[in-house]
From Swiss-Prot:
Location relative to the cell: Endoplasmic reticulum membrane
Keywords for this protein: Auxin signaling pathway, Endoplasmic reticulum, Membrane, Transmembrane, Transmembrane helix, Transport
Transmembrane domains' residue ranges: 6-26, 46-66, 74-94, 107-127, 145-165, 230-250, 274-294, 313-333, 338-358, 371-391
Protein name per its UniProtKB record: Protein PIN-LIKES 5
Organism: Arabidopsis thaliana
Gene this chain is encoded by: PILS5
One term of GO molecular function: auxin efflux transmembrane transporter activity
Lineage: Eukaryota, Viridiplantae, Streptophyta, Embryophyta, Tracheophyta
Length: 396
């Protein structure tokens, strides 16, 4: 498979995303005015509550069986490593470049969370369909490759809606805390500076008693709050959809209820799939709509973009090659080179589109997110081609 053929295959899904983003940008422009901020916020809530959970459920229920979980056990581990290593590298980028606090979570998220959704779903079968595909029989390659990509998509959604969701939520809480502290500072500066000194002295013993009580209850309170946060994240609609889909896929009798031509409740799966198909187009045009405002007012510096590009398209693929080849030499992976290709590809993908949904949901850095997505997806056209060529050379 030549470089130019691979360039065409690898660039198609990325160009598709860019075209859909341009549609959203045009609809949100001053000339068109069909997609204002209020419309984008409302659509984003529909994606979060309905479309994304349906997509997670439909993909996991259809593609994941207990046998697949056992034989493909390294894929969840590999994906966890992409999030862990990408998060650490993103943290280094934050420490080196020192961006504004509200951008820190976004930078770590874009470095760690790759687009495990529509890109592998399009890219892997497309490589199988090529006449000179190195992965053998076209129909077998396409069927198996689509299963790998679908499993990757479902797992990626689970990681993104737990780990990445927490990062963006943390940034939003940090911004909220800064705003509240500024309000308190303004109020205290406007308060009566001539207050009675004796009042403060009389209040001191009571303050000390309250402090002791708070210290005693602080540990348990923190533990309860931490468990409450975990429960909230697990009950987020996309995560809940992934968990239910995982259960239906792994339990055979539940799977037989909704999967298959003769399944009595097959309408549930077909409805979920139909709703889930709206996720990627809606997320992409929302991202494009935010892009107009982002290009006008974004605070993203070129060095931040360069740092993320270096992490996603230089450091991560090199580390991924080392991890996958080491795992193969240790006998952890199936002999199928297509499986190993998908594992390497997970280290090379541009940032997840779901990040845009999260920033819109919490109203934090959505303009900057659109700008980062634009540049990373433009670079992805060449990066995916070059690294796919290297992966195929190493595996075949």
């Amino acid at each position: 498979m030549g470089f130019w053929s691979l360039l065409e295959v690898a660039s198609m899904p990325v160009i598709q995303v860019l075209f859909m983003s341009l549609v959203g940008a045009f609809m949100a422009s001053d000339r068109c005015k069909l997609f204002p901020v209020e419309a984008r916020n409302s659509m984003n809530k529909v994606v979060f509550v309905l479309f994304a959970p349906a997509l997670m459920f439909a993909n996991l229920a259809q593609t994941v069986t207990l046998e697949d979980i056992i034989s493909w056990w390294f894929m969840p581990v590999n994906m966890g490593l992409t999030f862990l290593i990408g998060g650490l590298l993103g943290w280094l980028v934050v420490k080196i470049l020192k961006p504004p606090p509200y951008l820190e979570g976004l930078i770590v998220a874009t470095c760690s969370a790759g687009n495990m959704g529509n890109l592998p779903i399009i890219l892997v079968p497309a490589i199988c369909d090529e006449d000179k595909s190195p992965f053998g029989n076209r129909s077998v390659c396409r069927t198996v490759g689509l299963s790998y990509a679908s499993f990757s998509m479902a797992l990626g959604g689970f990681y993104i809606w737990t780990y990445t969701f927490r990062l963006i939520k943390g940034s939003a809480m940090k911004v909220q805390a800064i705003e509240e502290s500024e309000k308190i500072a303004i109020k205290s500066s406007n308060s009566d500076l001539e207050a009675d000194h004796k009042t403060h002295l009389l209040g001191a013993p009571e303050d000390k008693e309250n402090k002791v009580v708070k210290e005693k209850t602080g540990f348990w309170r923190k533990g309860v709050d931490f468990l409450h946060e975990i429960l909230e994240e697990l009950l987020a609609p996309p995560t809940l959809g992934a968990i239910i889909g995982f259960i239906f896929g792994a339990v055979r009798w539940l799977r037989n209820l909704i999967i298959g031509d003769d399944a009595p409740l097959r309408i549930v799966q077909s409805t979920a799939k139909l709703l889930g198909d709206g996720t990627i187009p809606c997320m992409t045009i929302i991202l494009g709509g935010n892009l107009i405002q982002g290009l006008r007012s974004s605070a993203v510096k070129p060095m931040v973009v360069l740092g993320i590009v270096c992490v996603r398209y230089i450091a991560m693929p090199i580390i991924g090659i080392g991890i996958v080849l080491t795992a193969a030499n240790l006998g952890f992976l199936p002999a199928d080179p297509l499986f190993q290709y998908v594992l390497m590809l997970q280290f090379t993908l541009p940032p997840a589109m779901n990040i845009g949904t999260m920033t819109q949901l919490y109203n934090v850095a959505q303009d900057e997110c659109s700008v980062l997505m634009l540049w990373t997806y433009l670079v992805a056209i060449l990066a995916l081609t070059v690294w796919s060529t290297i992966f195929l050379h190493l595996l075949v």
